Amino acid sequence: MAVLAGRTQRVLANGVYSGLAVTAALGALALGNALRHGLMAPMPAQTAVSASPQVDDARGTGHAAVAGLDAGALRHAGQGAAPSAALSRPISALSRSQGSDVPGNTSVSVRATSPRPLLATMPALEITPLREIPLGLVGDVAGLAQARDFMLVLGADGRLWARGLNTRGQLGVGIAQAQVNDFLPLPGHDYQAVAVGGAHALALDRQGNLWGWGDDRYGQLGRGRANHTPQDRPTRIARDIVAMAAGDRHSLAIRKDGALLAWGENRWGEVGNGSQESVTEPVVVGEGFRAVAAGAGYSLAIDRQGRLWAWGRGESGRLGTGNENDQSRPVLIGNGYRSVTASTAQSFAIGQDGTLWAWGSNLLGQLGDGTHEDRLSPVKIGSGYVAVAAGGAHAVGLQRDGSVWAWGSNGVGQLADGSLDDRLRPARIGRGYDFIGAAGAASTLARRDGVLRMAGARLLQ
């Protein structure tokens, strides 16, 4: 999940942690589909190919011009970059994850996380309609970050509100209550971006201070040591920050001078410092960066020249290097990128020309290229995109004309198209929203005036 500050975006959440563990999230999604279709689908072959897919419209079939170059952003839709796993909107060039892209700017929301075990919702396998989520006292929305079982909303007034599971202090509201059903305010009132990981969260205030709270067992809060006692209120991690991203158990940030910082779990090399030892305080792993995204055991970043870099876990091709090898230091993937989104095992990027690219796991068609084949290198999906958010095995995209598109697994109606049919290519599902989000087996569509609707698995009860 990633975030930039200073700009509003159209990406609510990247679903990076929407399937925190490929086994828990993706596995549950696969099982749901298997039950629905009567058998388990075979694992797709892993190949790297370039495709120029046809785009299906939810109401029929149509075609979309698929042209473009590289890409890279989180959620993007307004005039700027969008963070991974959170609410974002493009600016000049966006989730959340969701996520971010414009040099020197920060996005408004961040990326998201993993879904509740789908087995709980599986028996009925009914379509969950697009439903409105009451925001209580929040008011107008400027950003949103949703994780597997909790959600953070950034108000237009700079205040943060939280609701959901709180077993690791991930709400940041300073109470020991395990579940909070109404949105409660966090301390402080000058935030501009928020991001969520597996069970921790990050927020950036307007002075460039980076704050963190929640689970710190892997040093993901950057306090100098791993802590088994959760941090239930925001604690300052760093200063002079302009972009950030929260992964499953690690965190990334970019300083005003372009230095890329990383810390937390490092089992797969996701910190990028050349080792596999956890890092409990921020370390510099690169210079000249402007955007970051953090996924499940891996990291993505875009430098000021528009070059895309990847490191960490390589399984299923999520790094886009052309193979499945893990990388403990940043590896160059390509040029011409504007923003990037990281999720469980699939990645998306938007090129400087608005083309959408995807790579990684594709078991349930979540890449949108018309196949079930994993892609070890970026393949072109479509054009005209300003934001993309990724869930456990589905994705939602926002085009510059305001239309919203969805594709991938639809076992619990997360594509918001009124069906339970998976879609291997982008299908238009609506328009008129300012923000999009995806996490686990759920999708979120929101407007600036505080209207927030979700489809799919209920992340919040």
Provide a role label for each language-model segment.
Residues 1-8:
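N-terminal secretory signal peptides that target proteins for export/translocation
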Residues 8-461:
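Eukaryote-biased RCC1-like beta-propeller repeat architecture
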